[in-house]
């Protein structure tokens, strides 16, 4: 929430900075003693398709900058976490934003696609997986601009001279923060063979001590995945790794229907 507040403050600061430019003329006789200028204008309706992992903060990132420069916004939040976007729209209305300037539409993917393909949409912003983002970009109306923020498969490369003790906490936190449901989470670690066993054992030791449970409990370090299907998917990945020769260095079990133990 604090990051969302900071994002709103930045958008407010930028309002007065969106200026045009004056261009000195006089390069020809007909333009002597003349000045040209450019003006920036709102481009029109913005469609925003958001993600589930930081629902309020991401909605703010997509909605507030557009409103700050004079563009109305329609946001389609992730169906798993729709209330954050709905509440944001209610807050904006309470703050005095005119009706219609910020709208939240909770719908399935097919209906969400209509927001992108509509010729009335001047700009669309998407946060989510690469395949879906590029697909929507290919279906947008001619002239519609886009901003795509996709997930990654962020690697870390560990050289033999690395400070192992200093990096282990960061690697574990980077991999398991928010149960790994972050676009910039550590997903792959390439370690020089001379220190591979040492690094692997230390990561496993640190990961095995992470507290799994209710995210509302201050002691919890790894909370639930967004739904049961994601827990099934993690379990399938772990089993696939074992089938292909991988060695499990930690526990590898489900905790109820919504959590999976940090596994190395």
Please place each PLM-identified region on the residue numbering.
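Rossmann-like NAD(P) dinucleotide-binding subdomain of oxidoreductase/dehydrogenase enzymes
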Residues: 20-166
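Short amphipathic alpha-helical/adjacent loop interface patches that line ligand
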Residues: 5, 63, 85, 203, ...
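Long amphipathic alpha-helix in the N-terminal Rossmann-like dinucleotide-binding domain
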Residues: 1-21, 32-33
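ALDH superfamily catalytic-core signature
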Residues: 96, 123, 130-264
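Short linear capping/connector segments at secondary-structure termini
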Residues: 1, 23-31, 217-222
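Conserved catalytic core of two-component sensor histidine kinases
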Residues: 2, 82, 235
């Amino acid at each position: 929430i604090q990051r969302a507040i900071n994002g709103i403050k930045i958008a407010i600061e930028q309002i007065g900075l969106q200026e045009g430019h004056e261009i000195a003329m006089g390069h020809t006789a007909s333009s002597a003693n003349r000045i040209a200028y450019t003006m920036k204008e709102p481009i029109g309706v913005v469609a925003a398709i958001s993600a589930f992992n930081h629902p309020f903060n991401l909605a703010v990132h997509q909605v507030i900058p557009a409103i700050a420069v004079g563009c109305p916004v329609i946001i389609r939040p992730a169906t798993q976490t729709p209330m954050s976007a709905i509440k944001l729209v209610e807050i904006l209305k309470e703050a005095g934003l005119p009706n219609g300037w910020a709208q939240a539409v909770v719908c399935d993917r097919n209906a969400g696609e209509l927001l992108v393909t509509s010729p009335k949409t001047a700009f669309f912003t998407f946060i989510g997986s690469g395949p879906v983002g590029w697909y929507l970009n290919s279906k947008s109306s001619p002239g519609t601009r886009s901003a795509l923020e996709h997930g990654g498969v962020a690697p870390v490369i560990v050289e033999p001279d690395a400070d192992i003790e200093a990096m282990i906490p960061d690697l574990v936190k980077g991999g398991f923060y928010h149960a790994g449901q972050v676009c910039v989470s550590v997903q792959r670690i390439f370690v020089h063979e001379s220190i591979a066993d040492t690094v692997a054992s230390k990561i496993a030791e640190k990961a095995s001590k992470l507290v799994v449970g209710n995210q509302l409990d201050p002691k919890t370090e790894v909370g639930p995945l967004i739904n049961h299907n994601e827990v099934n998917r993690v379990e399938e990945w772990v089993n696939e790794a074992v089938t292909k020769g991988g060695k499990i260095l930690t526990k590898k079990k489900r905790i109820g229907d919504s959590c999976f133990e940090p596994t190395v």
